[in-house]
Amino acid sequence: MILPSILLLVAHTLEANVECGVRPLYDSRIQYSRIIEGQEAELGEFPWQVSIQESDHHFCGGSILSEWWILTVAHCFYAQELSPTDLRVRVGTNDLTTSPVELEVTTIIRHKGFKRLNMDNDIALLLLAKPLTFNELTVPICLPLWPAPPSWHECWVAGWGVTNSTDKESMSTDLMKVPMRIIEWEECLQMFPSLTTNMLCASYGNESYDACQGDSGGPLVCTTDPGSRWYQVGIISWGKSCGKKGFPGIYTVLAKYTLWIEKIAQTEGKPLDFRGQSSSNKKKNRQNNQLSKSPALNCPQSWLLPCLLSFALLRALSNWK
């Protein structure tokens, strides 16, 4: 358990000004019961979760990366006739029937390598018309840790999608959540021969927990320790029906696309770094660039733990000065 703790210390040092992946309003943990077979999420439990809507109808989920950017999947925008001006993004709420905070979209950017046949490269970005205002109910999610931890302590998905796999009209107006466990890629390949290395699988043992229609684009979020930051590991993409026992859901592996996200954000003039931090402040940009070039981040595998310890100590001393 030492390595994940060190990783979190480094992440916290790097992201002290970002406050991504935190849940300021959600201060208690409740046990899940038995969106398929889900439980209603608590207010502020997933403050990075957004509803993507057309004509006031929810059709896909997404997550907040920064004040300008929403992350989702490409297949939600496969219909060429869908215009950015038709979209609204609702933030800061679990209940879609309440008076919403809605934001307009100026640009839809699908990954050019998206393949509808096998759902490879199923990722997209939405550029907002105006920047988000962060608060207790509106918080960006952290992008994946580097290096990846050996295991995640806890993972969840949430959404407003179908809650009954036999009734496609059973869309929820309340945000529902289900626990998830990431499955070994080789094991999942046996069930899904079309699986690519840009995909991961997640389920919860033999339970029928799953995402479904309307949940696509929502985040799979994980944490390494209780009470620590949350990181988006995957994006809800596809699966074999909904909640079918023995068949996990398929998610886009977010770690494969951090460079793509950064490039798109820079091209559009609204850059962010790998952790979802806005880079409008040039001073912070320079600091992040220096950190990215630090020798401690290029250590041999055998020296990883000592390097991370040294790096965290140096950063703490630097901040103290």
Curated annotation (Swiss-Prot):
Question: Which residues, if any, are the signal sequence?
Answer: 1-16
Q: Which UniProt keywords apply?
A: Cell membrane, Cytoplasmic vesicle, Disulfide bond, Glycoprotein, GPI-anchor, Hydrolase, Lipoprotein, Membrane, Protease, Serine protease, Signal
Family, similarity comment: Belongs to the peptidase S1 family.
The UniProt disruption phenotype note reads: Deficient male display infertility with impaired sperm migration from uterus into oviduct and defective sperm-zona and sperm-egg recognition/binding. However, the mating activity, sperm production, sperm morphology, sperm motility, inducibility of AR, activity of acrosomal enzymes and in vitro sperm fertility are almost normal. Male show an absence of mature ADAM3 in sperm.
Q: Which principal EC class is assigned to this enzyme?
A: hydrolase
A GO term from the CC aspect = acrosomal vesicle
- Got any disulfides in this one, which pairs? 60-76, 155-222, 188-201, 212-242
Protein name according to UniProt? Serine protease 55
Q: In which tissues is it expressed?
A: Expressed in adult mouse testis.
CDD domains reported in the protein's UniProt record: Tryp_SPc
Source organism of this protein record: Mus musculus
Cross-referenced PANTHER family: ACROSIN-RELATED, SUPPRESSOR OF TUMORIGENICITY 14 PROTEIN HOMOLOG-RELATED
Q: What does this protein do?
A: Probable serine protease, which plays a crucial role in the fertility of male mice including sperm migration and sperm-egg interaction.
* Propeptide positions: 295-321
Query: Which superkingdom is the protein from?
Result: Eukaryota
User: Coiled-coil ranges per the record?
Assistant: none
Protein location: Cell membrane; Cytoplasmic vesicle, Secretory vesicle, Acrosome
List of catalytic residues: 75 (charge relay system), 122 (charge relay system), 216 (charge relay system)
Q: Which residues form the Peptidase S1 domain?
A: 35-266
UniProt xrefs under SUPFAM superfamilies: Trypsin-like serine proteases (SSF50494)
Q: Corresponding gene? A: Prss55
